[in-house]
Regions:
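Flexible phosphate-sensing "switch/lid" loops adjacent to ATP/NTP-binding sites
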Residues: 1-553
Length: 553
């Protein structure tokens, strides 16, 4: 059976029932049909004095084109904890339509461990991402309207981009304002994918609607004739934008196929943004459950670094344990084994590729000072000899390995890691950030590059050097740094998988996200608008005359 067929074969509980199981009354949710709901603001006030549960962060080794199943394992762990009678809640990101119709597919898990209704979640869900798109593009239209009606603020350069929640490389560089009308000034522009929009980051970092509005007002939109920054609040745009986001700021409640509550909210990418679900969703889940399972995008060098240095710093949180998801296929891929031979037993390939996993373990355990366990997401092609080799090697390093078979067995396939996590979260940690906010912008970038990526150093292109000095002069030198780079390698070169030679990270430019409260450093050739593959997933997605959807995975 396909994922969507498995999902449709399960009878879901009414969302009112799921809400009641975690102490939320029917009047405190806003239902979107029978199986989806928004959690109202009243709940935040009601649970504010509850004791926090334990926070478990799920990450992965460097991703491969084969997929590692991080969301699948996250769901399996939450279901597994319920199997051993622990009150667990999921706190995940919302899928973007770009990957759903592109190459990666959806983000609702797979097999017997999925969040549901999967086709709704993977498509429009409750409209959060569309609301973000509208707020983003409203700001663009307000900027151009201001320029049209006299340009009182003396815009010389507009840095704010429009967005759309699709992969569309044609929109990377465009020309706007070509109508020839008086006062419409043509200019070169571009689109970002919505999940890379600063408004997505703001939604995920805002504590409440008041904080949201303040952050929206602080968005840098352009520069005047004297190179002074111009902000959204100078255009009086923040109120209208916040109004568009009044429902989007409320976390969404759904369930797994085994009826574990799942709070799904926000969805920035981790390669081009900070890669975590919303602070509001995570904090709410911690008040409602004893164990909260959340994830950070891509590998531990990207999503986890940003989860810890950006999200946890802002929210005053820290994980009680970190799960690194690995697959034997991925380890062999990092060991140089071709995709066509990846399912064949190959101890030598594992021996060559396990270094990638070691580096992520070292970062979590020693660089961040956190408890760590490895979850091996098992496939049918994995052999006992391969599993034993990995287990023995991790034992030598004092790291526990748990075999997770959630895809095939549901929560029953994750009871081992669930029990191990119950023990692990009670161990003491010595959590530390990679850098302090008082350090120079370059120092922050270099600490991430050297300590987390393992680079020899950092090379700054001229535009990047200028931006660093400019942002410091503007008073933004104390912001955290969000490095945008490829997810496939510790380096900024996606083809450099082993990273066993000396390499440097090249920072070509920086972008100030004054509203979200961080600086983006662009490394390598990272794009903020992806393109579709030659044969996108969209080709296999269809709907019949009865409304049944096929092809989403």
């Amino acid at each position: 059976m396909t994922d969507i067929e498995i999902a449709k074969s399960v009878e879901l509980k009414k969302i009112t029932k799921i809400a009641s199981e975690i102490g939320i009354n029917e009047e405190d949710i806003e239902q979107y049909g029978s199986y989806k709901a928004k959690i109202s603001e009243n709940v935040f006030e009601k649970v504010k004095d509850n004791k926090n549960g334990k926070l478990v962060l799920v990450t992965a080794l460097s991703p491969t084109p084969l997929g590692e199943g991080k969301t699948t394992v996250s769901i399996a762990i939450a279901d597994g904890l319920r199997k051993i009678n622990k009150k667990s809640i999921l706190a995940l990101r919302e899928p973007s339509l770009g990957p759903v119709f592109g190459i990666k597919g959806g983000a609702t898990g797979g097999g017997k461990v999925q969040v549901a209704p999967m086709e709704d979640i993977n498509l429009h869900f409750t409209g959060d991402i569309h609301a973000i798109t509208s707020a983003n593009n409203l700001l663009s239209s307000i900027i151009d309207n201001h320029i049209y009606f006299g340009n009182e603020l003396k815009f010389k350069k507009v840095v704010w981009k429009r967005c759309v929640d699709l992969n569309d490389r044609q929109l990377r560089v465009i020309e706007t304002g070509l109508s020839g009308e008086k006062n419409i000034v043509p200019r070169q522009d571009s689109f970002d994918i919505t999940v890379a929009s600063e408004i997505m980051a703001i939604l995920c970092l805002a504590e409440n609607i008041t904080n949201l509005k303040e952050m929206l007002g602080n968005i840098l939109v352009g520069y005047d004739e004297k190179d002074n920054p111009i902000y959204a609040k100078q255009l009086k745009a923040e109120g209208a934008m916040a109004t568009l986001l009044k429902d989007a700021i409320k976390p969404n409640l759904v369930q797994t196929l085994e009826h574990t509550p799942a709070i799904i909210h926000g969805g920035p990418f981790a390669n081009i943004a900070h890669g975590c679900n919303s602070i509001r969703a995570t904090k709410l889940a911690l008040k409602l459950g004893d164990y909260v399972i959340t994830e950070a995008g891509f590998g531990a060098d990207l999503g986890t670094e940003k989860f810890l240095n950006i999200k946890c710093r802002k929210a005053n949180l820290k994980p009680d344990a970190v799960v690194i998801v690995a697959t034997i296929k991925a380890i062999k891929y990092h060991g140089g084994i071709e995709k066509e031979k990846i399912q064949e037993e190959n101890i030598e390939g594992i021996k060559n590729g396990i270094e990638n996993l070691y580096r992520h373990i070292d970062n979590i355990k020693n660089k961040f000072g956190l408890n760590v366990i490895v979850a091996l997401n098992r496939y049918n092609s994995d052999t006992e000899e391969e599993i034993k080799y990995i287990k023995d090697k991790l034992n030598e390093k004092g790291i526990e390995l748990s075999i997770v078979e959630g895809w095939a067995k549901g929560g029953e396939g994750a009871t081992d890691i669930a029990q191990k996590l119950v023990n692990l979260v009670e161990k003491e940690e010595d959590f530390k950030f990679t850098y302090s906010l008082e350090e120079d912008i370059k120092e922050k970038i270099e600490k991430i590059a050297k300590n987390i990526y393992g680079a020899k150093g950092v090379i700054y292109e001229e535009e990047a050097k200028q931006k660093i000095e400019q942002f410091k002069l503007q008073g933004y030198g104390n912001l955290p740094v969000c490095i945008a780079k490829t997810q496939y390698s510790f380096s900024d070169n996606p083809k450099n998988l082993k990273c066993d030679d000396e390499y440097y990270i090249t920072i070509r430019n920086l972008e100030l996200k004054a509203g979200a409260g961080f600086i983006v450093a662009l490394a390598g050739k990272i794009m903020t608008m992806p393109g579709l593959p030659k044969h996108p997933s969209a080709e296999s997605i269809d709907i019949d005359e009865k409304g049944n959807i096929v092809g989403i995975f």
